[in-house]
Amino acid sequence: MEDIVDQELSNYWEPSSFLQNEDFEYDRSWPLEEAISGSYDSSSPDGAASSPASKNIVSERNRRQKLNQRLFALRSVVPNITKMDKASIIKDAISYIEGLQYEEKKLEAEIRELESTPKSSLSFSKDFDRDLLVPVTSKKMKQLDSGSSTSLIEVLELKVTFMGERTMVVSVTCNKRTDTMVKLCEVFESLNLKILTSNLTSFSGMIFHTVFIEADEEEQEVLRLKIETGIGAYNETQSPTLSIDSLY
């Protein structure tokens, strides 16, 4: 009798025998979301068990939302836009910070060099400059040319990118000239755009202007042309008129 019982127990705990003796049913039609959505009645044992899973899902969703918001804010202060994925945002931010650190060290070295230079070596030479021999008319022409070039917004690059959720990113790169930042702000204000946020950064003799605008994807090309036209119209108003009297 004991041999029969031992044999039955041995067969029962074998994996194949165990699965055959136990009645397991798995309904493949159960959706994963239903299993963890927490839609069960909280008063039932199943509902009580699913409540922590539901809280975990909400917590994870909130965490990702906060992360996306922080990446969005980081993207708004980084001037160089390459791609909109998370890895590119972080990579661009690191490159931008490294560039700023390099410029900081460079400026600090120049300041130390100026502070260590004796004042006597900074005195002007008594030799006449060749520019003094240039006729007055030519000098006036140069001043006019210089004045007109510094008063214009010289755009090096203009990008308009659709980010989704009715958000368009405009990135303008310009040469750094007198009051260029103020002029760019005046241009964008004159266009009556729905600006969400904007950022202006000066780096290595250039100005990077990043603007987030509320617009649909279909407006991307129209928006780009509108900005180009606005900058061109502003430059035309800033170009000085040349007169004979101004040469003397």
Swiss-Prot record:
> So where does this one cross the membrane?
none
Biased composition of type Low complexity is found at 37-54
Q: Which residues form the bHLH domain?
A: 51-100
Q: Name one GO cellular component term.
A: nucleus
Task: Give expression by tissue.
Answer: Expressed constitutively in roots, leaves, stems, and flowers.
Task: Note the coiled coil stretches, chain numbering.
Answer: none
Where does the record place the region Disordered? 37-60
InterPro entries associated with the record: bHLH-TF_ACT-like_plant, bHLH_dom, HLH_DNA-bd_sf, TF_AMS/ICE1/BHLH6-like
Q: Which UniProt keywords apply?
A: DNA-binding, Nucleus, Transcription, Transcription regulation
Q: Can you provide one Gene Ontology molecular function annotated for this UniProt record?
A: DNA binding
Any one of the GO BP annotations: regulation of DNA-templated transcription
What are the subcellular locations of this protein? Answer: Nucleus
* Subunit structure as annotated in this protein's UniProt entry: Homodimer.
Task: List the protein's name.
Answer: Transcription factor bHLH35
Question: Can you name the source organism?
Answer: Arabidopsis thaliana (Mouse-ear cress)
Lineage of the source organism?
A: Eukaryota, Viridiplantae, Streptophyta, Embryophyta, Tracheophyta
